[in-house]
Amino acid sequence: MPNNEPPQEESSTFVRPKKQKDWRVVAIRIGVIAAVTVLVCLFILRPMVISGGSMMPTYSDKGFTFGFLPYFKIYAPQRKQVVILKHAGFNTFLLKRVLAFPGETVEIRNGVLYVNGKELDEPYVKYPCDWNLSRREVPKGKIFVLGDNRSMPIQNHMGGMIDKSRLAGVPIW
């Protein structure tokens, strides 16, 4: 006699095997993350601790910032812009402010900076000084930089005429 009942489907259960993290995959992921972090910190966003008071009050001694290093591969420096300069090797940098460009003249009289004979408005300079620097022209390939804390003796500042090739980047904050 024919069976008129519909065929019954076989009940089968599919059990997924538990995924076990392979330690090698985890190690590779951690290694890739570490390598990318190191490369970003060395060549793009470098963390920096500020040492010294030449940029006070804009940047305080023992302060922290990130330097955006590829900035000058994209943009040209601007007057009054704070820049990061290469100094004495791979791990030492300076923060200074760009004040004059090639072909311009600079002079400091009684602490007042003149560019091309005109007083430069510097609202970021909070500590006055009595420096004097005779009129001079910024040579080709150089820029004139100074720190914001002018109350420090001029001999203690690592600024003045510097090669544009020393521009390393800009602080982010």
Q: What is each model feature region?
A:
Residues M1-W173:
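Extended hydrophobic leader/signal-anchor segments used for secretion and membrane insertion
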